[in-house]
C-alpha cells in the first residue's frame, strides 16, 4: 500500500514538473503564417560542418545529419517567435522587413539586426533565442533546419531565460 502511494505521489510530482515546463514556455505572438514548404531525408550519410565568424573554434558539427526542413515564416510588426531552440543548425534568410535576434546566453541582451537580403546561421543544438519584428512592416524569413529528427520537432519552445526586459 505504501509503495502504491509513493508511486502515485512520484507520478504527480513528475506530471507537475512536466506541466510546469510547458507553463513557463514562451510561445510566439503575431505569427501571420509559418508554412513548411519542404521536408526531406538525406539518402546518404551527411556529416555537416558550419564555420561561423571565421573563428576556427566556432564550428557547428552535425555528424550523421537527419532530416532537413524548409519553412517560410511571416511575423507581423510587434510579433515574435517566443523563446525557443532547434535540434540542429538553421540557415535563415530575410526576404522582407527586419528581424531582431536576441541570444538567451547574452546577459546584456544585445540585439542583432538582420534586414532583407541578409542571412545568418543559428547554431541550434539547444541554443535558446528569440526573434522579434520590431519594425513597422511584416517580417518574411525563410529557414532551412538541419538535423531534424525524422517526423520530430524542428522548433522547441523554451522558457524565458530572464536576460531581456521585454
Go through each PLM region and give its residues.
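Conserved hydrophobic/aromatic beta-strand scaffold that supports enzyme active sites
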Residues: 70-72, 91, 111, 119-121, ...
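Short acidic-glycine-tyrosine-enriched beta hairpin
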Residues: 75, 104-126
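Glycine- and acidic-residue-biased ligand/ion/polar-headgroup-sensing regions
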Residues: 86-107, 116-118
Amino acid at each position: 500500500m505504501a509503495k502504491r502511494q509513493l508511486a502515485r505521489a512520484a507520478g504527480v510530482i513528475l506530471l507537475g514538473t512536466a506541466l510546469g515546463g510547458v507553463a513557463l514556455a514562451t510561445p510566439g505572438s503575431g505569427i501571420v503564417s509559418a508554412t513548411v514548404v519542404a521536408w526531406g531525408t538525406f539518402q546518404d550519410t551527411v556529416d555537416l560542418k558550419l564555420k561561423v565568424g571565421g573563428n576556427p573554434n566556432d564550428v557547428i558539427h552535425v555528424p550523421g545529419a537527419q532530416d532537413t526542413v524548409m519553412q517560410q515564416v511571416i511575423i507581423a510588426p510587434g510579433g515574435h517567435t517566443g523563446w525557443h531552440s532547434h535540434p540542429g543548425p538553421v540557415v535563415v534568410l530575410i526576404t522582407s522587413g527586419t528581424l531582431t535576434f536576441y541570444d538567451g546566453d547574452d546577459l546584456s541582451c544585445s540585439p542583432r539586426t538582420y534586414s532583407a537580403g541578409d542571412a545568418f546561421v543559428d547554431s541550434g543544438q539547444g541554443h535558446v533565442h528569440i526573434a522579434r519584428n520590431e519594425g513597422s512592416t511584416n517580417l518574411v524569413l525563410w529557414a532551412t533546419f538541419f538535423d531534424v529528427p525524422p517526423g520530430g520537432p524542428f522548433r522547441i519552445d523554451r522558457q524565458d531565460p530572464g536576460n531581456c526586459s521585454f
